Amino acid sequence: MKDNQAKYPQLRFKCFTDPWEQRKLGKMGYTFTGLSGKTKEDFGHGNAKFVTYMNVFSSPVSNSEMVENVEVDSKQHQVEYGDVFFTTSSETPQEVGMSSVWLETAENIYLNSFCFGYHPMVEFDPYYLAFMLRSPVIRKKFMLLAQGISRYNISKNKVMEMLVPVPEIVEQQKIGSFFKQLDDTITLHQRKLAKLKELKQGYLQKLFPKNGSKFPQLRFAGFADAWEQRKLTEIVNRVNKSSNSDVLPKVEFEDIVSGEGRLNKDISSKLDSRKGTLFESENILYGKLRPYLKNWLFPDFEGVALGDFWVFEATDVSVPSFDYYLIQSDDYRKVANDTSGTKMPRSDWKNVSSTDFAIPSKDEQKQIGAFFKQLDDTITLHQRKLEKLQELKKGYLQKMFC
């Protein structure tokens, strides 16, 4: 493909009809290296800062706070506003050449040695540049440049030969502003979600007794009695109904989102004839394998649990939703983490089942269960909103660049 060949994106803002130029990066700017000649003694102190590899890797726009101290000399290249950073190496070709644009004017800032920099010499809207370089059409080009077997690398000279779409600056500004606003909205939802999850963890700490105590730190009004000590087998039954149904959905350990008690994908079509433990709606699925922050699910459907799961059902002396949150409490997790085995450590049923847990009256169980259920519903709502926004962004990145 020749430089300057015209193209049209699939989706555009109104009033823009001109074709987009395809231009080589190397004809619009120059590259520079990151820190060189440094030893580990140079890092962690000094008056200069450097942009970390993870800062570049994790976002199309660099975070000015993700920098660390370093001692520098006059040979090093300071970064400037509008510079682009590229990662040069990764374990997979999909993650090579991840880009990030620096939008700060602070001095004495440098780039880490595992990335290279690019300084544009033509006018670019920085946000257009940031999201264009992360668009699927450009990411595919980077993957094709990746070379290696156990670790993949790219040549900055090859990157400079890459053709990228360059519309008029006014259209760039429109696109850049659009994606910046969308990213800001996503960030806002991520922060809200993180705060809700922190809130839940705080309440799990305070609404359940700790370290053998019979009284929680925080209680609902009207409850003052000591909690009774009950073994787990007194509040849940362990289900052992095996099934190899090829009609019911199958749940595996990796399907559960870490620490959230929900599935990370739709498993309705994941049907096969493998044998597992049959579970019903509102049973509790508890994975025995580490990590234990990713091992519980309270399904609202019937299915088959494959592999290392315990399936619990609440007994008639307790409230199902209370059991669900009891299993997330600190005391239960300590017992579950008392594992046996080395290669694949597992919780020990004899240990878990015989351990005493503090249990309140049924009325207090209802209050606690309802409270956490409402909090979980709010978390799920924000999670879904966030996922929809992320899918929306993914779709626009696919259609708005060529």
Task: Kindly give the residue locations of the regions a language model identified.
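Short, recurring structural edge motifs at helix starts
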Residues: M1-K2, Q10-C15, G37, V70, ...
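Short amphipathic coiled-coil heptad-repeat segments
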Residues: M1-T17, R191-D225, R384-C402
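A short glycine-rich beta-alpha junction/loop motif
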Residues: Q5, S36-T39, I109-F114, A146-E171, ...
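Non-catalytic DNA-recognition/assembly elements of restriction-modification systems
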Residues: R12-L35, R219-S242
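Short, charge-patterned binding micro-sites
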Residues: R23, A106, Y110, K214
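Sequence-specific dsDNA recognition surfaces
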Residues: G26-T39, M54-V84, I235-N240, L248-S281
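A short beta-sheet element
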Residues: T52-Y53, S64, N69-R134, N264, ...
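Extracellular/lumenal glycan-associated surfaces
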Residues: Q173-T185, H189-K192, E228-R230, I284, ...
